[in-house]
Amino acid sequence: MAFRLSSAVLLAALVAAPAYAAPTTTTKVDIAAFDPDKDGTIDLKEALAAGSAAFDKLDPDKDGTLDAKELKGRVSEADLKKLDPDNDGTLDKKEYLAAVEAQFKAANPDNDGTIDARELASPAGSALVNLIR
């Protein structure tokens, strides 16, 4: 129950404020970078795989968490607090991937399970790119 509530709060926070950081310029190249099956769209599985790889890249001390310094440019300190259900000041991989999933859903307003170039160019899509690049 607590996980569902925290997931609902997380999703609400993400949908209410779709951009964590300054939007990036998004092009078809961005899709190709996260689209290993080359179908021209990003599905949730691909977004989570890219998010997992991004998390690993962002965690140079390999402590399994990302703090505000490691998240700089991807998640503001204010948004870190919203995304941190255990309030320890860091995001572990599970918390980070929950943010990726929620942002994927925010960037997919037609709920077709994939993000195309138009959706990726939206503010919510740009915020997703910030998390998975």
Curated annotation (Swiss-Prot):
GO molecular function, one term: calcium ion binding
UniProt cross-references to InterPro entries, sorted A to Z: EF-hand-dom_pair, EF_Hand_1_Ca_BS, EF_hand_dom
Temperature and thermostability: REE-LanM complexes are stable over a broad temperature range (up to 95 degrees Celsius).
Entry-linked SUPFAM superfamilies: EF-hand
Alphabetical UniProt keywords: Metal-binding, Periplasm, Repeat, Signal
Gene3D superfamilies: EF-hand
Annotated signal sequence range: 1-21
Coiled coil: none
Pfam families the record matches: EF-hand_5
Keyword Translocase set for record: no
The keyword Metal-binding appears for this protein: yes
UniProt-annotated binding residues for Nd(3+) 3: 84, 86, 88, 90, 95
GO CC field: periplasmic space
pH dependence text: REE-LanM complexes are remarkably resilient under acidic conditions, retaining REE binding down to pH 2.5.
Residue sites binding Nd(3+) 4 per the record: 108, 110, 112, 114, 119
Biotech use, per record: Has been used for metal extraction from two distinct rare-earth elements (REEs)-containing industrial feedstocks covering a broad range of REE and non-REE concentrations, namely, precombustion coal (lignite) and electronic waste leachates. After only a single all-aqueous step, quantitative and selective recovery of the REEs from all non-REEs initially present (Li, Na, Mg, Ca, Sr, Al, Si, Mn, Fe, Co, Ni, Cu, Zn, and U) was achieved, demonstrating the universal selectivity of LanM for REEs against non-REEs and its potential application even for industrial low-grade sources.
Main location: periplasm
Miscellaneous: Lanthanides are essential cofactors in some pyrroloquinoline quinone (PQQ)-dependent alcohol dehydrogenase enzymes in the methylotrophic bacterium M.extorquens.
Function: High-affinity lanthanide (Ln)-binding protein. Shows 100 million-fold selectivity for La(3+) over Ca(2+). Binds 3 equiv of Ln(3+) with picomolar affinity and a fourth with approximately micromolar affinity. May be involved in receiving and then transporting lanthanides (such as La(3+), Nd(3+) and Sm(3+)) to a specific periplasmic destination.
The protein, known as: Lanmodulin
Encoding gene, per UniProt annotation: lanM
